[in-house]
Amino acid sequence: MSTTISDSIASMISRINDIVITVAPSGDSNDSHRHSQIICDGGRTIQPLDDSSETTLAYADPNNPYLSNIDGDFRPIEQLSEEAAVEQATQLREAIREHDYQYYIRASPIIADRAYDILFDRLQALEDIFNLDTEASPTRRVGGEPLDELETVEHVTSMLSIDQSTAVDSVRDFDERVRDVVGDLEYICEPKFDGLSVEVIYEDGEYIRAATRGDGNRGDDVTAQVETVGAVPLKLHGDYPSYLAVRGEVYMPKAGFREYNRERIECDEKPFANPRNAAAGTLRQLDPGVVAERPLSCFFYDILDATELPPDQWTTLNDLQSWGLRTNDRISRVDSIDDAIAYRDQLKAARAELNYEIDGTVIKVNDRGNREILGATSRSVRWAFAYKFPPRAEITHITDIVVQVGRTGRLTPVALLDPVDVGGVTVSRASLHNPEEIKRLSVNSGDEVRVRRAGDVIPEVAEVTQKRATGTFNFPNQCPICHSSVEQDGPLAFCTGGLTCDAQLVRTIVHYGSRSALDIDGLGEQRVEQLVESGVIGELADLYTLSVADLSKLDGWGTTSAENLIQAISETQTPSLTDFLVGLGIPEVGPTIARNLAGTFDNFDAIIDADEAALREIEDIGPTVSTHISEFFTNEQNRAAIDNLLSAGVTPQTQQSTATTNAPLSDLTFVFTGSLSVPRTTATTYIERHGGNATGSVSSNTDYLVIGDNPGSTKRIDAERNDVPEIDETEFTELLAEHDDTLTWPP
């Protein structure tokens, strides 16, 4: 047997007690009776025997599905007592976690992949045969049962975005703003990963939940998917806090992406455009087993909440690493913005060498106290800035220019291109934005142009490199869909047809039923186009008068699919006021502003009647947004569409209207901190089910801060600042009984 194999397996079992592995000698692969034996004696002594040794202690079992085509096996499982199996499984879990830590965190694997697989397969066999599976077992990474759909969950604290720019002047402006408030400071500079941001929660060191960023307040529950990612530990390492919520970036390494796309092409499947799309698409798979087969990885870079928060970002990164949460090794601690700019330039030069995609750097204020002073808006933090790389660009030709009609009636010119690779993505269409941009570029079909991906995402025409066509594209004065007249609003052009324009109607209905609005399952764009083109739907309110007969006569519809859609639509007749406002498609009104509107006014009519001055008093609503809201509700076509929705039985529910005798906790807002007797998600669901609100951060609107074991300091400081009373779980139980003696805790 070769020294390399012997050394690898010796290392492999150095942490496992009283396990025997037999390995066929390399000299004669056909000799099934000659084995080298390696014994680990209580984890202390390793005794590899020479190649001439013979043993009958263990033989490869061709009927064992967990050990196929390998060089060795452990003692036959049927010879183990249940007690021995439990002990061996515990030892194997510890060994595999240690090897995961060495591989993902220290990047210094001490065993070969083949040897690791032997350990993993043995553990899986023990767990299946003796029913020993645990929540934190490494074998859970192979993926569980497929899900019916992705649930939406609320984050423990808002996952805010970061202001960004490719201009160095913007970076210096950020530095001046920060120093004006807090004076001298340190920055931590990190790569800006181009993947999918996730929140991961651990309780008592064990993996509990993972969710995508979503809108920053709520995201998709991807717990089953993320637990298959090898770089995400299911059990933390070292001296970890009892409660921990962290932020990381799931990504697909470049090498894995290339290999995965090669496999898709061989199977006649469409390849992914880039690693980010591949990672995002994979993580949203309903079958965790599919996720487990794809090459995802993860970097962690922030602590969102914990029983005790580190004093600064540098300590945060070191703590994450010590707990087995993989951090990036290209991080710098600097004193000046010049050094931060230099870091970005160095990272840009090294970008092609990295095995993961980045699109810039993130400059963060190091000290947590300074961060709290700087604060945040509802959208982004004020203590960090993303210095982006300039978008990649290539030269190609325009073959045609078409005009698209959006949901709000906005007309957008789009250049059709000879396909060109821009930063690893094949681009065949690029935005020309608006009529003014066409005039500025003096562009027409046939011209040679430079195309770039704005923000490394959206293709756009940057400039004409060679004029090959005569003149400039003539922008239409009629809508290309409904032929209504086109009106100019500054640099933008709009169709005046409103919801009588099929293009606007289709996009309006799709938006109304989207997950960020009323979340109508089965109401995708292709189905809506079919419903509009066939004349089954002529306006938004027609959704609520659809019948099985209407749908069954259309191609591709059966009785079951028709009944399912009608049921999904009927469940939205009493939407929350927030979701209804989002669904209406008011320009610039997303979930945050809709939530602020719903929380300020008593009912929907009050919002409709509010003047711009009253609207501007609301958080996050300035002159532009207030004008959009006011104009939307004074538009006759919009008012008619809303009246028809209300006549069809749609009744938006305010917080006040949902406060019934069956909602004993209505009007109460709770925040939890520390480890509770139940998972945080269970507590949140319980509060909401009984009419209350459970939020991730303390504000003046919070009624109670519920304190669990080992609570964090930030929420308690905020509670003291806002005069919010603190109660423990016992007092919380008593409070529930005061409101309704049928409420019990734990639920």
UniProtKB/Swiss-Prot annotation:
Identify the residues that bind NAD(+): 113-117, 161-162, 190, 213, 249, 364, 388
**Which InterPro entries does the protein's record reference?**
BRCT_dom, BRCT_dom_sf, DisA/LigA_HHH, DNA_ligase, DNA_ligase_CS, DNAligase_adenylation, DNAligase_N, NA-bd_OB-fold
Question: Any idea of its EC number?
Answer: 6.5.1.2
Domain BRCT as annotated: residue spans: 660-747
Molecular function per GO? DNA ligase (NAD+) activity; metal ion binding
Query: Sorted alphabetically, which keywords does the UniProt record give?
Result: DNA damage, DNA repair, DNA replication, Ligase, Magnesium, Manganese, Metal-binding, NAD, Zinc
> Would you kindly state one Gene Ontology biological process term found in this protein's UniProt entry?
DNA replication
Q: Which CDD domains match?
A: BRCT_DNA_ligase_like (cd17748), LIGANc (cd00114)
Identify which residues the record assigns to the active site. Answer: 192
**One GO CC annotation:** cytosol
Family under the similarity heading: Belongs to the NAD-dependent DNA ligase family. LigA subfamily.
Q: Which NCBIfam families match?
A: dnlj, PRK07956.1, PRK14351.1
Q: What is this protein called?
A: DNA ligase
- Organism equals Haloquadratum walsbyi (strain DSM 16790 / HBSQ001)
The protein's gene is named: ligA
